[in-house]
């Protein structure tokens, strides 16, 4: 293609993504757009086509972003090239959203006509505004009996401040309004700006590992052209690779002769290790490099840490390989080896949040067949020592001796909770119980309230989300961002079994709740740990002070069964003998801790 044609083609490209809260119909809308543009034959069509992971389809959530090229012949007779970049809606996957938005010029904002705006809708809209995208609101599910599109329209204008007068009323399920949406994309989403003649600059927004071709980069070309045979260079580490193939996704990968400015597609360049390709990096040509990289989006830091251990210790290397493979297309997953006396060898992993942690654990168990034990999640604490030093600790077993600690600071998050008015009391009670500080509360409309709290992240990590859903019958929506570190009265609690510390059961707790938390755990462990041949004390200790204790009674054989009647001294002799044997067992016996015991520390609650 000559320059003229390339520029004309660039004017026909529209890059957009779809943003929405969970369950507002984003994946269904994507399905309809694929059908309408006949990208996918009706034979291949299946619900949630872009959610290719089993886990995504089962939970009905989108975890990974996907990019697809569609051709659409508009009413003006021209054929446009659409790149649809599907994004997740859940708060833990915000970084997935931010990177797919970096590859777009426009965003379709889907709002449920019955539910209105939810907390994550707002969070994603702000991300889109940060990226200067053209936002087109769409009111979906208008065929529901409870739909009230007009009040949602005013809500979009009041809460977000977008002009919703032209918002398309649609129903992705019934296929209503799909054509209008496509026409609006043509009119409203700007064509990519960028210079075909400039040196190549392409943003890596994802990478997938292919066993045969190595790492495949998903890129959005910002300037220039890339074709097979070019030598490309990654700007963050200056490594060079030879391009073997470029192409696009029409869900399936299809090879192409070139990718030009504005295109979204993939580059295969037999890159061997995932570590070479950071998502957010810039690809350029080695022969004619760009002067400076694109400003990539920010590196996401994990907020939640937990230990992952294989149940069979010989699977340690398999677990490492599995984590490396997952890290390939999940740049936010971090891990380092660690050992525990109770659990053997494993990894300390960092996650973006609880759903992320859940999904990773499930993918490890499913895709790689590794049975795991997971320790209680913890956050990063800043520990200031008496000698003026300070250290970051994410693992309770690394906490220094209490006598050396001057203060401990913990991360607080700004939690935004949207909830129907009748549940405000329940939400406030929950937030208070989780040591939250009230910030503000505004009414969105007559019925819905936006409550903002500062809550310690450690309290959210446990089971805040489940509690929030159950106390509001599932109506609350919730979004959080890290706000600051604050000093807190925190202590480390150890659990002792038969006098020995079990390092994997240690956790950090606020001093005011230490006693009840300790009591709860020892009682819970008593139910879970099977009875042994000897008596086992379970103790909860802070430093050297025991705050709670309970005993698991010994199993004992009835040694008197063989004495029919007979002298009491004979019975006493047998009982004394049994007692001495139990005592000896206790001094050398060790206690097996079942997997549920580690999880029970997690699902701690004020039952």
From Swiss-Prot:
InterPro entries: EF-4, EFG_III/V, EFG_V-like, EFTu-like_2, G_TR_CS, LepA_C_sf, LepA_CTD, LepA_IV. GO terms for cellular component: plasma membrane. It is found in: Cell membrane. It catalyses: GTP + H2O = GDP + phosphate + H(+). SUPFAM superfamilies: EF-G C-terminal domain-like (SSF54980), P-loop containing nucleoside triphosphate hydrolases (SSF52540), Translation proteins (SSF50447). It is a peripheral membrane protein. GTP binds at residues 23-28, 140-143. GO terms for molecular function: GTP binding; GTPase activity; ribosome binding; translation elongation factor activity. Residues 11-193 form the tr-type G domain. Its main location: membrane. Its EC number is 3.6.5.n1. Required for accurate and efficient protein synthesis under certain stress conditions. May act as a fidelity factor of the translation reaction, by catalyzing a one-codon backward translocation of tRNAs on improperly translocated ribosomes. Back-translocation proceeds from a post-translocation (POST) complex to a pre-translocation (PRE) complex, thus giving elongation factor G a second chance to translocate the tRNAs correctly. Binds to ribosomes in a GTP-dependent manner. This is Elongation factor 4. It comes from Streptococcus pneumoniae (strain JJA).
């Amino acid at each position: 293609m000559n320059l003229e044609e390339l520029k004309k083609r660039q004017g026909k490209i529209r890059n957009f993504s779809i943003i929405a809260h969970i369950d507002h119909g984003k994946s269904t809308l994507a399905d309809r757009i694929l059908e309408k543009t006949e990208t996918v034959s009706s034979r291949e069509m299946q619900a949630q086509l872009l959610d290719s992971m089993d886990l995504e389809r089962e939970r009905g959530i989108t975890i990974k972003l996907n990019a697809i090229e569609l051709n659409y012949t508009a009413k003006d007779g021209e054929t446009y090239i659409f790149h649809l970049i599907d994004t997740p809606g859940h708060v833990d996957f915000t970084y997935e959203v931010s990177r797919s938005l970096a590859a777009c010029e426009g965003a379709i904002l889907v709002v449920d006509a019955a539910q209105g705006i939810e907390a994550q809708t707002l969070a994603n809209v702000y991300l889109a505004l940060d990226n200067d995208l053209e936002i087109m609101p769409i009111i979906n599910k208008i065929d529901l009996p409870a739909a009230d599109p007009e009040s949602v329209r005013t809500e979009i204008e009041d809460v977000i401040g977008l002009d919703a007068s032209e918002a398309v009323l649609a129903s992705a399920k019934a296929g209503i309004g799909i054509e209008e949406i496509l026409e609006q994309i043509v009119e409203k989403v700007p064509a990519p700006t960028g210079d075909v003649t400039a040196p190549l600059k392409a943003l890596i927004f994802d990478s997938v590992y292919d066993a045969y071709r190595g790492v495949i980069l998903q890129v959005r070309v910002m300037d220039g052209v890339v074709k097979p045979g070019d030598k490309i260079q990654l700007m963050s580490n200056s490594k060079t690779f030879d391009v073997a193939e470029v192409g696009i996704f029409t869900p399936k990968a299809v090879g192409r002769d070139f990718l030009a400015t504005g295109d979204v597609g993939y580059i295969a360049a037999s890159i061997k290790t995932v570590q070479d390709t950071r998502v957010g990096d810039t690809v350029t040509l080695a022969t004619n490099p760009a002067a400076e990289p694109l400003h990539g989006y920010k590196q996401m830091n994990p907020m939640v840490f937990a230990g992952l251990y294989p149940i069979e210790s010989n699977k340690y290397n398999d677990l490492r390989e599995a984590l490396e493979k997952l890290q390939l297309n999940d740049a936010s997953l971090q891990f380092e080896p660690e050992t525990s006396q109770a659990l053997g060898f494993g990894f300390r992993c960092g996650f973006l949040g609880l759903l992320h942690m859940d999904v990773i654990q499930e993918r490890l168990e499913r895709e790689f067949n590794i049975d795991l034990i997971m320790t209680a999640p913890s956050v990063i604490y800043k520990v200031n020592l008496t000698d003026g030093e300070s250290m970051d600790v994410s693992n309770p077993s690394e906490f220094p001796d209490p006598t050396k600690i001057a203060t401990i600071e913990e991360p607080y998050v700004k939690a935004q909770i949207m909830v129907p008015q009748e549940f405000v009391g329940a939400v406030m009670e929950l937030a208070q119980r989780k040591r939250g500080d009230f910030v503000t509360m505004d009414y969105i409309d007559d019925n819905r309230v936006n409550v903002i709290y500062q809550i310690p992240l450690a309290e959210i990590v446990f089971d805040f989300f489940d509690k929030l859903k159950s106390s509001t019958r599932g109506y609350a929506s919730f979004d959080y961002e890290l706000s600051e570190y604050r000093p807190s009265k925190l202590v480390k609690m150890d659990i002792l079994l038969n006098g020995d510390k079990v390092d994997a059961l240690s956790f950090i707790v606020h001093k005011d709740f230490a006693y009840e938390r300790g009591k709860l755990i020892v009682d819970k462990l008593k139910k879970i740990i099977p009875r042994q041949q000897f008596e086992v004390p379970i103790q909860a200790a802070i430093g050297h002070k025991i705050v709670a204790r309970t005993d698991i009674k010994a199993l004992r054989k009835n040694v008197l069964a063989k004495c029919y009647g007979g002298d009491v001294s004979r019975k006493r002799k047998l009982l004394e003998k049994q007692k001495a044997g139990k005592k000896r067992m206790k001094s050398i016996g060790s206690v097996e801790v079942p997997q549920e015991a580690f999880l029970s520390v997690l699902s701690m609650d004020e039952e």
